[in-house]
Amino acid sequence: MGTPTALRKTRAVLTGTSFADNTTGAITAQMVRQFTESGMGGYATICAKAGTPASQAVASGATATIDWNAGSTGADAVDDTGTVSSTTVGTDADFANDRIRIYDKGFFMVNLGVSFVQTGTDTVIWTFRIATQDTGGSVVYPGYDAAVQKVAATLDNMASASGIIDTTGHTTYTDVLAQVKNGHGSSSENFQMHYGQLSVFRVG
């Protein structure tokens, strides 16, 4: 799999500094892909479009992964995934499973935007969180959060968050998740997403 070291190694080979006798060792198709992506980028987007929004119950104080399918006509908008030497590479937009899966090792910009309402009239602070998960392991929060206070079930509100994540240490893949936390102190609340986008693109 590609790493910053592999990128430097591939760059050295492709610029001819060690190509003649290959003193730095063999380069693989995966390394070449990683090198190419560092220049042109890997990418993926899932989105929730117009539909009939459905309520997603979030327990008091709990954080839940946003259900992109709930009443939405959304889809995998675009992605860049493929196979090199029987190994899955690139980035996979996975609307059906509420995630973007990154197979490549590198640095990715993540952008999240959500238009939403709540169905109750309580005062609730909703916190939207970008989360990552290494090959089915623990969910990690890199600190890219955004909070919105809702006091009524009326107009839509918007929330957005962004940041750069590091996938160079993952085992097989990194899942990128959009999550929402119910900040009400005592009751479950219903969150309703009208529109939303979750995107990643490679920056290094």
Where are these regions (language model features)?
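Extracellular jelly-roll beta-sandwich "head" domains, especially the C-terminal globular C1q domain
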Residues: 27-204
